[in-house]
From Swiss-Prot:
Enzyme class: lyase
InterPro entries: Enolase, Enolase-like_C_sf, Enolase-like_N, Enolase_C, Enolase_CS, Enolase_N
Catalytic activity: (2R)-2-phosphoglycerate = phosphoenolpyruvate + H2O
GO biological process, one term: glycolytic process
EC number annotated for this UniProt entry: 4.2.1.11
Cofactor descriptive note: Binds a second Mg(2+) ion via substrate during catalysis.
Signal peptide: none
Source species of the chain: Photorhabdus laumondii subsp. laumondii (strain DSM 15139 / CIP 105565 / TT01) (Photorhabdus luminescens subsp. laumondii)
Name of the featured protein: Enolase
C-alpha cells in the first residue's frame, strides 16, 4: 500500500512572488503527499544548489522549470515502484542519481520537494500524522516536544528594505506554559510594537518574515523598541520574554578589508571587536541566542566568539554550518558555536536533515528548526520540530500567512498530543537550562 505509483512536479509561487518547486507523490491505495521547497535570501555559500532556469524572459530568470522537469522526468522514473516508507532509500536514490556534491544536476529544490512529499504520503499510508512518522524515521518513536518559538518581530538586513544591518530581532515567550500561550504572548508584543513604532513616527510595514521593518538609528534602538513593546504588553523582559538575534554577519562583512561594516550605524569592526560589540548588547539586554555572529568563513573569529560568549548564550550556526553534517562535524571538533540552525533546503533532503539534527544533539549542540525568508503555505517544519523534539523553531513573526501557517499547525499538533508533547521553554536554549 506504500508503493509509489506517480510523481508530479509543478512550478508554484512563494511568499516573495518568485517561483518554487512543488511535488506530489502518489501511492497505491490513493495516498498522496504534497510539499513545496522554500527559498532563502541571505544564503550560505556552501548550501545545496537551488536550481533556477536563468531565462530572463520568464520570472526575470528565476523560473524553476528545469527543476520541475527533473521531478517529472528522471526523479519520477527512479522512485516509481519504490516503498515510500523507506525514506532513506528514496532520498539516496535521488541523491545518487543527481550525482553531484551540491545537488546541482536536479537542484536541491527538486529533490527536497519530492523528499518531503514522499514523507507526507508515507505518513498518510501509515495512518498517522507527519510528526509521528518523522519521530519514527528519527529513531525516536513517540518522543515529542513543542518548540519554543523565536519570533522575528523586527526585520533588517536582506529581509527588509531599511537601514537596519542586523537581519532579525526576535522574541522568545519563555513565560508561556504552552506553545499556544507562547503564540498569544508573541502576538500581544507584536501588536504593541506597532504602537511603539507609530508613536515614534516610524513605519509599520513588514519585511519578508512578517516583522516590522522601520529605519532605526542603531541595532540597540531596535532592542529598545522591543523592550518598550514587551512592557506595554504587560510582560517583564528577561522573565516573560527573552531576546534573540540573527546577525547574518556574512551580509555586512567586507572580504577586502576583513572588517564588519554596519552601514546603518556608520561603524566598522574587526572580527574580535564585533564579538565585543555583541557582548555589550548581551549585557544591556536579555539576549540568549545569537545566530551567525560573524562571516561564515571566519572560523578563527567564531572560535574566539565561542570562547567569549559560548558559556553564557546560545551561538547558532546557519550560513556557518548550512545543515551539512560534514561542516558541522568540523565545527564540533574545533569548538565552533554550540547550536545549529536546521533548514531543509540548505542540504536538500529529509534524511540528511535528520542526520544533522542527530549529530548536533549527540555533540551537546542544540538544533533550531527554521523557515526561509521565501516560504509557502507548506508547514512541514512544524511537524519536523515536534517529531524530532528539537525544542526551538524560527518561523517568522505574527503576520503573513506563510509564517502563521506554521504557528497554526503547531497549535493543532499541541492540541492533538496534549501532555505527550511538553513545552520546555527556555530550558531548550543552550546555556539557559
Amino acid at each position: 500500500m506504500s508503493k509509489i505509483v506517480k510523481v508530479i512536479g509543478r512550478e508554484i509561487i512563494d511568499s516573495r512572488g518568485n517561483p518554487t518547486v512543488e511535488a506530489e507523490v502518489h501511492l497505491e491505495g490513493g495516498f498522496v503527499g504534497l510539499a513545496a521547497a522554500p527559498s532563502g535570501a541571505s544564503t550560505g555559500s556552501r548550501e545545496a544548489l537551488e536550481l533556477r532556469d536563468g531565462d530572463k524572459s520568464r520570472f526575470m530568470g528565476k523560473g524553476v522549470l528545469k527543476a520541475v522537469d527533473a521531478v517529472n522526468g528522471p526523479i519520477a522514473q527512479a522512485v516509481i515502484g519504490q516503498d515510500a516508507k523507506d525514506q532513506a532509500n528514496i532520498d539516496k536514490i535521488m541523491i545518487d542519481l543527481d550525482g553531484t556534491e551540491n545537488k546541482s544536476q536536479f537542484g536541491a529544490n527538486a529533490i527536497l520537494a519530492v523528499s518531503l512529499a514522499n514523507a507526507k504520503a508515507a505518513a498518510a499510508a501509515k495512518g498517522m500524522p507527519l510528526y509521528e512518522h518523522i519521530a519514527e524515521l528519527n529513531g525516536t518513536p513517540g518522543k515529542f516536544s513543542m518548540p519554543l518559538p523565536m519570533m522575528n518581530i523586527i526585520n533588517g538586513g536582506e529581509h527588509a528594505d531599511n537601514n537596519v544591518d542586523i537581519q532579525e530581532f526576535m522574541i522568545q515567550p519563555i513565560g508561556a506554559k504552552t506553545l499556544k500561550e507562547a503564540v498569544r504572548i508573541g502576538s500581544e508584543v507584536f501588536h504593541n510594537l506597532a504602537k511603539v513604532l507609530k508613536a515614534k513616527g516610524m513605519s509599520t510595514a513588514v519585511g519578508d518574515e512578517g516583522g516590522y521593518a522601520p529605519n532605526l538609528e542603531s541595532n540597540a534602538a531596535a532592542l529598545a523598541a522591543i523592550k518598550e513593546a514587551v512592557e506595554q504588553a504587560g510582560y517583564v523582559l528577561g522573565k516573560d520574554v527573552t531576546l534573540a538575534m540573527d546577525c547574518a554577519a556574512s551580509e555586512f562583512y567586507n572580504p577586502e578589508t576583513g572588517n564588519y561594516e554596519l552601514k546603518g550605524e556608520g561603524k566598522t569592526f574587526t572580527s574580535q571587536e564585533f564579538t565585543h560589540y555583541l557582548e555589550d548588547l548581551t549585557r544591556k539586554y536579555p539576549i540568549v541566542s545569537i545566530e551567525d555572529g560573524l562571516n561564515e568563513s571566519d572560523w578563527e573569529g567564531f572560535a574566539y566568539q565561542t570562547k567569549v560568549l559560548g558559556e553564557k548564550i546560545q551561538l547558532v550556526g546557519d550560513d556557518l554550518f548550512v545543515t551539512n553534517t560534514k561542516i558541522l562535524k568540523e565545527g564540533i571538533e574545533k569548538g565552533i558555536a554550540n547550536s545549529i540552525l536546521i533548514k531543509f533546503n540548505q542540504i536538500g533532503s529529509l534524511t540528511e536533515t535528520l542526520a544533522a539534527i542527530k549529530m548536533a544533539k549527540d555533540a551537546g549542540y542544540t538544533a533550531v528548526i527554521s523557515h526561509r525568508s521565501g516560504e509557502t503555505e507548506d508547514a512541514t517544519i512544524a511537524d519536523l520540530a515536534v517529531g524530532t523534539a528539537a525544542g526551538q523553531i524560527k518561523t517568522g513573526s505574527m503576520s503573513r500567512s506563510d509564517r502563521v501557517a506554521k504557528y497554526n499547525q503547531l497549535i493543532r499538533i499541541e492540541e492533538a498530543l496534549g501532555n505527550r508533547a511538553p513545552f520546555y521553554g527556555l530550558k531548550e536554549v543552550k546555556g539557559q537550562a
